[in-house]
Amino acid sequence: MANFKLFLALAACLSGQALAAPTKTIGKRAAITDVAHGYASQNGGTTGGAGGTTTTVSSYAQFTEAVSSDDAKIVIVDGTITETADQVKVGSNTSIIGKDANAILEGFGLLVKEKENVIIRNLGVKKVLADNGDAIGVQYSNNVWIDHCDVSSDRDHDKDYYDGLIDLTHAADYVTVSNTFVHDHWKAMLFGHSDSNGDEDTGHLRITVNNNYLNNLNSRGPSFRFGTGHLYNNYYLDVSDGINTRQGAQLLVEGNVWSGGKKPLYSTDDGYAVARDNDFGDGENTAPEGTLTSVPYEYDLLAASAVKDAVVGTAGQTLTF
């Protein structure tokens, strides 16, 4: 049911001008009541804390308390919160919204585990040590929307100093990752954590990944096991290993662009992909042909030639409310 609109005029409007660095951003007006698209729009949809109480937080203690319950709630993060700590557990029916580009969690990440209906938007998460988990982790949970976030660490340390940036594992389902700046990291995004977890993951891990900017990554853009993925209109700059489809995963890969990197789309162990209108740069698609040719939701698809200008400077913490 894809609505294949190659709306170049809209892309030009969003980009304004060709941007060479994410420091030049294009603000986009958003509403706290926005709801998810992609796979997160399925299974009843993802509305987060819509209709619940609104709380603004600026400290670690305030934040951990505000996000913990399963009651409907909107938590607005004001400023940078720094704490070297384990992932904070997020309750169901939660919207976590960064007030502006200064809303950053540094040293600790988020864990959505055995929950549902969570939105994380306009939030920075950075430099979470491996001992403290991933920047954003989703496990045994469904209907999660990660949008306009900025997740990063650095590559000054070895690959095991930090863990993942966005890891969706243990049968996570109906998740959308969109408009997010994923950068400066070794192992970026892991969807399905183990070759031996097929009994749990098969039939789940339905994930949309769209309009993200991935820059200076070594691998996992993403690494995708067992599930069903729709990856479209993402821009990859200097990503060594891009999309790795594995263990029977079926991916629909459309309108993505790579600059730098030799392995844009590949499979290390029996994953599959249908690829349409991608610009693989200096690399090539070596993934076996898959069977996923459509998805159960409508979406707007940019031509590959319009993706860079539409994504760079728009992905990341660029929303205003």
Swiss-Prot record:
Cofactor: Ca(2+)
Gene name per UniProt: plyA
Subcellular location: Secreted
Cofactor stoichiometry and binding remark: Binds 1 Ca(2+) ion per subunit.
Keywords: Calcium, Carbohydrate metabolism, Cell wall biogenesis/degradation, Glycoprotein, Lyase, Metal-binding, Polysaccharide degradation, Secreted, Signal
Chain's role: Pectinolytic enzyme consist of four classes of enzymes: pectin lyase, polygalacturonase, pectin methylesterase and rhamnogalacturonase. Among pectinolytic enzymes, pectin lyase is the most important in depolymerization of pectin, since it cleaves internal glycosidic bonds of highly methylated pectins. Favors pectate, the anion, over pectin, the methyl ester.
One annotated GO biological process: pectin catabolic process
Cellular component, GO annotation: extracellular region
Entries under SUPFAM superfamilies matching the protein: Pectin lyase-like
Name this protein carries in UniProt: Probable pectate lyase A
Name of one Pfam family that matches: Pectate_lyase_4
Residues the record marks as active site: 220
